[in-house]
C-alpha cells in the first residue's frame, strides 16, 4: 500500500510539472467525426449521449443494456449502500431496453458534463438535484414522467424493475422541452472554437470533447505487467465487481461479486470491455453524513487492455475530460473501444486486486 502511495504521488508530481512543457498526445485528424465515448467512428454525429443510472445491488440479477453501452461508470457514492452503474450510449436512438433505472448521482453527471449527456434516472438526492439545477440540466426522471417512458412488471408504487428504451425516451423529450441534439450554447470553449474554425457554407456538425484520450492506432508505453487475467474491484465487504480476460474476444468480461457472469437481460450476453480504468481518487463525506464527494482533479490508477496492465497518473485534460501519464510522466492515449471506468476511494477501504492466469497477484492495492 505504501508503494502505491509513493508511486501515485511521484507520478502526480511528474505529471503536474510536465503538463506545462510537454504537449498532450496528438490524435491524428480525420474527416470522420469520432465518438466521444469510444474514440471510434461516430455513428450518431451531432447527438447528445444518454447516461442511465441502473441498480447494481447483489440482488440485481436482472440488468438490461449492459452489453451494448459504450461506457460504464461505477463508484460508491454512499458508504453504507451498494454501487450503482451508469450506462452511457452515444445517442437516444442507440439506447436499448435499459434498467433497472436507479436514483441519479451527481458524480456521474460531473464526470460527463463535457459530453452534454442527457441524464436518465429514478429520482435522486439533494446533491443530484442541486447539480442539475445549477447547470440547468433536465433529466428524464421516472418519478416525473412515470409510465409515459418507463415500464415495470410489478405494481408501479412499489420498488419495481423500472426500465426504459430509446424509443420510450424519444416519446417524452418534446413534452419535457429536452433536445436530443448537441447545443452550441453548451459546448466547451475548446469545442466551440474548433467548430467556429471549421465553419463553411454548410453548418458544421457540432461535436464535444471526448471523455478519454483515445486512439485507434499508435505506440503505447511499455506495460507495467503482462498476463493481467483477472481483476477484482472491491467497493465494500459485500460489494465488488470482477473481470476475467477473454483472449478470444480481446475483452474483459464482467463478473458479479460471487464470480458469476454479469449478463445483459436483453440478450443473455456477458458484458465485456476493451478498456478497464480503475482510478484512485480522494474522497470525503459530505455535510449530509451519507454521501461521498470525490476529488476529480488528479490521482493514480491502472489501465488494462489486451491482457496487459499499465500504471498511470490521471489529471483533468485540456482536449478531453481526462489526461493520462505513464510511469515516466509522458502523456499517452488509450486504445479506442468500449470502456469501464471505476473511481476507487480509500475512505471505505476499497481496493483493487489483479492476478495473472496462474493466480499470482500482480497488484493488491488499497486506494491511496
Where are these regions (language model features)?
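C-terminal motif of bacterial Sec signal peptides marking the signal peptidase cleavage site
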Residues: 17-20
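Bacterial signal peptide processing site
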Residues: 22-25
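A surface/extracellular/periplasmic glyco- and lipid-processing/surface-interacting theme
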Residues: 28-73, 79-368
Amino acid at each position: 500500500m505504501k508503494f502505491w502511495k509513493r508511486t501515485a504521488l511521484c507520478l502526480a508530481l511528474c505529471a503536474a510539472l510536465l503538463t506545462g512543457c510537454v504537449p498532450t498526445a496528438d490524435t491524428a485528424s480525420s474527416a470522420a467525426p469520432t465518438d466521444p465515448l469510444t474514440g471510434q467512428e461516430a455513428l450518431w454525429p451531432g447527438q447528445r449521449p444518454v447516461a442511465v443510472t441502473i441498480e447494481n445491488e447483489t440482488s440485481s440479477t436482472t440488468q438490461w443494456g449492459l452489453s451494448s453501452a459504450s461506457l460504464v461508470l461505477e463508484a460508491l457514492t454512499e458508504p453504507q449502500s451498494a454501487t450503482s452503474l451508469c450506462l452511457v450510449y452515444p445517442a437516444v436512438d442507440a439506447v436499448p431496453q435499459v434498467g433497472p433505472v436507479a436514483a441519479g448521482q451527481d458524480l456521474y453527471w460531473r464526470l460527463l458534463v463535457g459530453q452534454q449527456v442527457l441524464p436518465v434516472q429514478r429520482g435522486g438526492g439533494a446533491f443530484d438535484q442541486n447539480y442539475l439545477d445549477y447547470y440547468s440540466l433536465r433529466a428524464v426522471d421516472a418519478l416525473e414522467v412515470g409510465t409515459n417512458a418507463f415500464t415495470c412488471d410489478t405494481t408501479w408504487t412499489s420498488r419495481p424493475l423500472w426500465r426504459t428504451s430509446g424509443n420510450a425516451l424519444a416519446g417524452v423529450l418534446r413534452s419535457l422541452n429536452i433536445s436530443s441534439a448537441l447545443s452550441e450554447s453548451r459546448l466547451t470553449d475548446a469545442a466551440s472554437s474548433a467548430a467556429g474554425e471549421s465553419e463553411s457554407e454548410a453548418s458544421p456538425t457540432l461535436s464535444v470533447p471526448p471523455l478519454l484520450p483515445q486512439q485507434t492506432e499508435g505506440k503505447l508505453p511499455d506495460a507495467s505487467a503482462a498476463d493481467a487475467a483477472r481483476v477484482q474491484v472491491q467497493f465494500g465487504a459485500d460489494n465488488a465487481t470482477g473481470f476475467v480476460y477473454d483472449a478470444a474476444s480481446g475483452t474483459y468480461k464482467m463478473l458479479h461479486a460471487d464470480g458469476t457472469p454479469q449478463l445483459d437481460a436483453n440478450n443473455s450476453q456477458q458484458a465485456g470491455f476493451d478498456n478497464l480504468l480503475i482510478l484512485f481518487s480522494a474522497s470525503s463525506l459530505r455535510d449530509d453524513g451519507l454521501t461521498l464527494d470525490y476529488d476529480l482533479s488528479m490521482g493514480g490508477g491502472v489501465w488494462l487492455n489486451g491482457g496487459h496492465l499499465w500504471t498511470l497518473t490521471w489529471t483533468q485534460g485540456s482536449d478531453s475530460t481526462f489526461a493520462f501519464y505513464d510511469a515516466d510522466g509522458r502523456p499517452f492515449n488509450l486504445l479506442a473501444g468500449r470502456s469501464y471506468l471505476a473511481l476507487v476511494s480509500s475512505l471505505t477501504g476499497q481496493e483493487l486486486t489483479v492476478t495473472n492466469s496462474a493466480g499470482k497477484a500482480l497488484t493488491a492495492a488499497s486506494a491511496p
